[in-house]
Amino acid sequence: GMLAQVGVTVNLDAKPKAQHFPLITDGKTDFYMLGWGVPTYDSEYIFNFLVHGRESDIGTWNGTGFDNDELDAKIKSLASNTDLAARNQDIADIWRVVQDETLYIPIHHQVLNWGMTDGVGIEVDPEDQPKVKYFTMN
């Protein structure tokens, strides 16, 4: 499989999300698959949940054990930084650390599978998001 191509040997342990997610949020697994959509299209969203060290309301999905106070301060500053050039530089700096530390292995990109039938029409959107307003009933 894909993971073997990068030297990672795994034994699949498929679980319902009600059993899988607590393993991540409670830090009880060393390796896991997690899909993460970014509705804001902003790196801050990813950093808040997946990179920032665990606190009561931030870093809640960081199952890596990674914790860096200096980086956490930069992540928090993104929410109020209005200097676009400085904010973009902070985002680039944070991504550099994330990549250098190899916090995540982006080996799998899951997309929606589209089912079609003659009775229902829908445009397949390039953003991979079905928009109900474009549904037609034939």
Model feature map: region roles:
Residues 1-5, 22, 26, 69-76, ...:
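Solvent-exposed, polar/charged alpha-helical surfaces in well-ordered, non-transmembrane soluble domains
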Residues 2-55, 90-91:
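Periplasmic binding protein-like
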Residues 12, 16, 35, 39, ...:
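Extracytoplasmic/periplasmic, Sec-exported soluble proteins
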Residues 17, 54, 87, 96, ...:
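Arginine residue identity/basic-tract feature
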Residues 23-28, 48-80, 109-138:
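Short, solvent-exposed loop/beta-turn-alpha elements that line the ligand-binding surface or hinge
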Residues 28, 32-36, 81-118:
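Bilobed periplasmic-binding protein-like "clamshell/Venus-flytrap" ligand-binding domains
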